[in-house]
Each structure stands twice: as structure tokens, then as C-alpha cells.
Amino acid sequence: MMMMNYNFPYYQKLAEGVGCEKEVDFVSCYLSPEKFRLPEKMREVARRISERGKFRVINFKTKSELRKYAVKIGEAYNKTFVNNWEYYPLSEREIKFVIDQLIVNAVPKLYKIILYNDDVAGFLLGFPDISEALIRQKGHITPWGVVDFMLELNRTKWVSLNGAGVLPEYHGRGGNALMYYEMERTMIESKYKHAELTQVAETAVQM
């Protein structure tokens, strides 16, 4: 999955030179699995929320398990970002297309969904970062390049978290604490040495 595009520093001056103004910034945050630790208070909130039983986390072991929840994840994605500046809902056809593309190379253990009773309340989607392979292939897709991309999926030590959210109605009810708790667990328990939280709008203050 492609994450944030890279813009050279001089792009800003060029754009401003023809009268463009900044609308919103999207930021990327580096997280070190070795150093990223939630405050104990937030961990305690997450544990209590889990113990009450209304919120629960679904972990996946196989792609077939993931596919069963794929449509619900797509629907939750639409609802989660409804208040974001760039929000535009995906159609059913677009949801299916995105799901089909993602599941091909999905690492099930990097996908988590949070249920409230039986409804999807939030999700955390992680993707192995194959940027090094893209750099080696200079952006070209060749037969060898495809092999390199596939090998990089297992070789990379970087994971990109580009899909983390809790539906607005569950904010302030423990959903966010549970999501961050799962983010911490995912990074600690995985093989990855580096993590990046990508494409976060500066207006998304709840993050």
C-alpha cells in the first residue's frame, strides 16, 4: 500500500508563488516499538473497558478470517472519518476494490477491529513497509521488481499504521484508549523494529 507522497521542499514556494494557500497539513509520526509506551493510566482504562465486556478486540490469524469482517471494516472506515477535512465516502464498489487489493498482501496479525457488542466501533490497520524495495526498483514495476516487493514484505523491519480510528459515537467511552492499547501491543509483539503512523490530518486532534 502506498502511504504519503514525498514533496520536495521547494514545492511549497512554487505553490505559494502562484497564489495557493495551505488548507491543511497531513503529518507522519515515527514510533519506536522499543520506546513507545502508553501511560499506565491509559492502559488501566483499556483493561477496565475490556473487562466490562461491551468492547472487545478481534484479532486475525488468517486472511479468510479477515475477509469475513472486510465489508464491516469498510463501512466503519466511512463512518469514522466523517468529520475529517478531506472526507469523502467510499462507494460499495470502491470498498470491495480496496478490500480485494489489501487482502492479497495482508498480514492478518496487523489488522485489529474493536467491537462494541457486535458492531464495529474502531479498527487498526497495519501494513509492512516496502519502501526500500520501491527505492531499489526506482518506482518501476518489472517481473524482478514484483519478486523484490514480495520478498520485502517478509524482510522489512518497518510497519506503517495507515488506518486507525474509532467511530465518533465511541469517543470518550474508552474506544480510543483501547485502540492505542492495541497499537502498543501490536508493535511490541511483532517482529518490526520501526513503526510509522501516517496520513494524520492536523485537524484530527483526537489522535
Regions picked out by a protein language model, each given a short descriptive name:
Residues V18, T80, T186:
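Short alpha-helical functional segments enriched in proximate histidine and acidic residues
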Residues I135-L151, L178-M187, L197, A201:
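Low-complexity, glycine/alanine/valine/leucine- and proline-rich hydrophobic stretches
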Residues M1-K61:
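Acyl-donor-binding surface of acyltransferase catalytic domains
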Residues F60, E65-V166:
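A conserved beta-strand-loop-helix scaffold within acyl/acetyltransferase catalytic domains
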Residues M1-M2, W158-V159, M187-A201:
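Conserved GNAT acetyl-CoA-binding A-motif
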Residues M1-Y10, S32, L167-P168, L197-M207:
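Conserved beta-strand-loop-alpha-helix junction that forms the acyl-donor binding cleft
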Residues Y30, I113-L115, L125, E196-Q199:
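Short beta-strand segments
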Residues W158, N162-L167, H171-M187:
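Conserved acetyl-CoA-binding loop-helix of GNAT-fold acetyltransferases
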